[in-house]
């Protein structure tokens, strides 16, 4: 109830400013002290996946904490894992503001952020300083000015810099807000990417005597034929996991609703069915050889269960946290 009162005030503010305010609020020492006094500990519901032990199945999706500034405070919510980023080799501003739009009537969010971040070196320093002992995924992308033909170099730079500090690495090739990025999901570009990141993973494994799983984050706008092809390639190159899915460019589910004409990726409840359909196709074609992290439209315990039933091994939340607050996460953890 308390969060919904705060949400009314937050929704009067520009979404990007509100986002920053909430993170700063969670990071304040007073709030952290009150949490220790009034919030009961979350029971451990450990699960093994990708060779890692997660405290529970519920993770925070990338995008909430792009630069790793708030890892410790977000971990107090109870997440079994936290994914930071998307981060690029060099800092970049992203797309012009405004670039986030709420669609409250259907619990949706449209964003066209464009990988705004402070660069890989800044994030690495924050991960090194973090006191969180759980699973930290680091989501990486290419810089806007990097040509698509040279994109692999950006991913390899990031892998080399974060490998020692990451629990797993997420390769973001599916954001709709960086020009041509989604081309990396197709043809020879996709195969070259998978081949080169596995080669780099092997090099880093030898260097640090530490195996860090690599997962690929894909689009919900792929056809069944394309998903089958991707599944086959993920198996062939022995990729460690797949995140399904990123945001969608399909806004047909929100006709005649405020902000529906804004360009960008749509997430939240309108993404739920698309994401579930993708997970189901992946599950059938991956044949349990590669784990699936399901994300998109989780706003209740039932929708969390649906993701698992479709074939997800782990799930992630973003929009659900914005619309329903931290208690929503704890309820899912307790009941899933």
Swiss-Prot record:
Its UniProt entry gives the catalysed reaction(s) as: (S)-dihydroorotate + a quinone = orotate + a quinol
Set out the biological process GO terms recorded for this chain's protein: 'de novo' pyrimidine nucleobase biosynthetic process; 'de novo' UMP biosynthetic process
Q: Which GO terms describe its cellular component?
A: cytoplasm; plasma membrane
Pathway per its UniProt entry is: Pyrimidine metabolism; UMP biosynthesis via de novo pathway; orotate from (S)-dihydroorotate (quinone route): step 1/1
Listed binding positions for FMN are: 62-66, 86, 139, 172, 217, 245, 268, 297, 318-319
The note on cofactor binding and number reads: Binds 1 FMN per subunit.
Localization recorded for this chain is: Cell membrane
Q: Which GO terms describe its molecular function?
A: dihydroorotate dehydrogenase (quinone) activity
Provide the topology term for how it sits in the membrane.
Peripheral membrane protein
Q: Does the keyword 4Fe-4S apply?
A: no
Q: What class of enzyme is it?
A: oxidoreductase
Q: Where's it mainly located?
A: membrane
The record's annotation in HAMAP family points to:
DHO_dh_type2
| Oligomer and partners | Monomer.
* NCBIfam families per record: PRK05286.1-1, PRK05286.1-2, PRK05286.1-4, PRK05286.2-5, pyrD_sub2
Q: What is this protein called?
A: Dihydroorotate dehydrogenase (quinone)
What species was this sequence derived from? Buchnera aphidicola subsp. Schizaphis graminum (strain Sg)
Q: Source gene?
A: pyrD
